[in-house]
Amino acid sequence: MRQSGRKSNQLRPISLELSPLINAEGSCLIKIGNTHVMCSATCETTVPPFLRGQNQGWITAEYGMIPGSTSHRIKREAALGKQGGRTQEIQRLIGRAMRCVINLQKLGERQIIIDCDVINADGGTRTAAITGSYVALHLAIRSLMKKRILKVNPLISQIAAISCGIYKGNAVLDLDYLEDSDAEVDSNFVFACNGNLIEVQGTAEKEPFSEEQFLAMLKLAKSGVVELFKLQNQVLIAAE
């Protein structure tokens, strides 16, 4: 039995608040249980040096946790003078994921920066950030098209992500912090809406896990992202 009382295939309560930030082209506050992440997408008319003159766009991401997002205050990385390895890993993951669902040539010579700020952390912050960032990106593209900055929609797919793990010997979906800190296996799955995988991260915390356990987690993850895709579509259609 999970401490939260949830079934093994049950997500935490989820909400997506659209456009909480008035200045970004697109923004979304995603809440999955007690994990809350502010995601925004901002467009710039410059691209990285390696893309100048290529008539191609770029998407990059930044990720951070505010000091009061966990039980013990986190020092601001800006105050420390450098980003931690975890931060760099997660923001690269978010950037890679977003680039998988957009035609960079159709984006033109401009860059969209995804910013993810964890307001409250209770497990699954990186997967929540990806799911919320897609919504922010979608809204940003919609805004650019309404302004006729873009003539063709460069989005080619939809993206969502969820965590799974082996907890007390069982495959479970959407781990919270208590489960994650005591799980035998911790994994993250990033999906396109056609069911294809974009990225998989999996780590055995105590002992190696079997192919059977991996497939059990994959099955749970696929069922979970279906719900996430439905919610993304519902809120985006309602905001048209």
Curated annotation (Swiss-Prot):
One of its GO terms (molecular function) is tRNA nucleotidyltransferase activity. It catalyses: tRNA(n+1) + phosphate = tRNA(n) + a ribonucleoside 5'-diphosphate. Its EC number is 2.7.7.56. The keyword rRNA processing applies. GO terms for biological process: rRNA catabolic process; rRNA processing; tRNA processing. Phosphorolytic 3'-5' exoribonuclease that plays an important role in tRNA 3'-end maturation. Removes nucleotide residues following the 3'-CCA terminus of tRNAs; can also add nucleotides to the ends of RNA molecules by using nucleoside diphosphates as substrates, but this may not be physiologically important. Probably plays a role in initiation of 16S rRNA degradation (leading to ribosome degradation) during starvation. This is Ribonuclease PH. It comes from Rickettsia prowazekii (strain Madrid E).
